[in-house]
């Protein structure tokens, strides 16, 4: 069974009297335990597509299916629960909460999802060990380096053991060494957890190391 399917996804924006089509009839199927790169020029709609796949933005038309169940039939409360339980997100800018520690940031989705404090803490500590930040548990995230912040964001994205990880330029704001560390962690942890990873990237070398690469060009998706 295909894990996630986008069928005939289109997205238009209104600019005065003009309608601007950004995505045109996108079809994309995502299988279990695969890494898919989405590449394309700046402004081609890559982030818009990722936001639609993450149910953060609604398409103008088209359908999303998760394990053959229509995602668009869910109400806002059900969508929020779906995102927290089944989708993990990591962005170019980590979006960590600066007033909280590394450990607290990673625990947050689990607590919101109804996990108790002890279970949330144990899972967060385990993930932070996996991303080699066990020595930074009680540090405020503002005291971490850029690479450490992004590794914290990765641990947070995995805390609910999602089926799909959506990554928007996760290495784009890092130096080459830190970016390589984050990518290797994404790949290795994804394989271990049998995640499907969908990554928007401008880095063609990273895209070539994934199972699949698709290109957004003039609003349409092309397989490479």
UniProtKB/Swiss-Prot annotation:
Q: Write out the function statement from the record.
A: Part of the ABC transporter complex LolCDE involved in the translocation of mature outer membrane-directed lipoproteins, from the inner membrane to the periplasmic chaperone, LolA. Responsible for the formation of the LolA-lipoprotein complex in an ATP-dependent manner.
Q: Keywords assigned by UniProt?
A: ATP-binding, Cell inner membrane, Cell membrane, Membrane, Nucleotide-binding, Translocase, Transport
* Location of the ABC transporter domain: 4-224
- From the Swiss-Prot or TrEMBL record, give the protein name: Lipoprotein-releasing system ATP-binding protein LolD
Is Aminoacyl-tRNA synthetase included in the keywords of this UniProt record? Answer: no
State the similarity comment: Belongs to the ABC transporter superfamily. Lipoprotein translocase (TC 3.A.1.125) family.
A Pfam family assignment: ABC_tran
Q: Which GO terms describe its cellular component?
A: plasma membrane
Keyword Membrane part of the UniProt annotation: yes
EC number(s) on file: 7.6.2.-
Q: Which residues bind ATP?
A: 40-47
- Looking at the record's lineage, which domain of life comes first? Bacteria
Membrane topology designation: Peripheral membrane protein
Query: Which EC main class describes this enzyme?
Result: translocase
Which GO molecular function, any one, fits this protein according to its record? ATP hydrolysis activity
Gene3D superfamilies in the record: P-loop containing nucleotide triphosphate hydrolases
Q: How does it assemble?
A: The complex is composed of two ATP-binding proteins (LolD) and two transmembrane proteins (LolC and LolE).
Q: Where in the cell is it found?
A: Cell inner membrane
Question: Its principal location?
Answer: membrane
């Amino acid at each position: 069974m295909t894990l996630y399917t986008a069928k005939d996804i289109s997205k238009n924006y209104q600019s005065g009297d003009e309608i601007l089509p950004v995505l045109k009839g996108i079809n994309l199927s995502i299988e279990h335990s695969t890494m898919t790169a989405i590449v394309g020029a700046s402004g081609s709609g890559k982030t818009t597509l990722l936001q639609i796949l993450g149910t953060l933005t609604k398409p103008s038309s088209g359908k999303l299916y998760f394990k053959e169940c229509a995602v668009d039939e869910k109400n806002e409360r059900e969508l929020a629960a779906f995102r927290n339980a089944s989708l993990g997100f990591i962005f170019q800018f980590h979006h960590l909460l600066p007033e909280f520690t590394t450990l607290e940031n990673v625990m947050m989705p689990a607590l919101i999802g109804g996990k108790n404090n002890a279970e949330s803490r144990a899972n967060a500590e385990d993930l932070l060990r996996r991303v080699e930040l066990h020595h930074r548990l009680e540090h405020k995230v503002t005291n971490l380096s850029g690479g450490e912040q992004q590794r914290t964001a990765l641990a947070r994205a995995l805390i609910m053991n999602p089926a799909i990880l959506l990554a928007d330029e996760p290495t784009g704001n890092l130096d080459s060494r830190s970016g390589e560390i984050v990518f290797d962690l994404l790949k290795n942890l994804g394989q271990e957890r049998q995640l499907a990873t969908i990554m928007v990237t401008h880095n063609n070398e990273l895209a070539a190391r994934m199972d699949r690469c698709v290109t957004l060009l003039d609003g349409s998706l092309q397989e490479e």
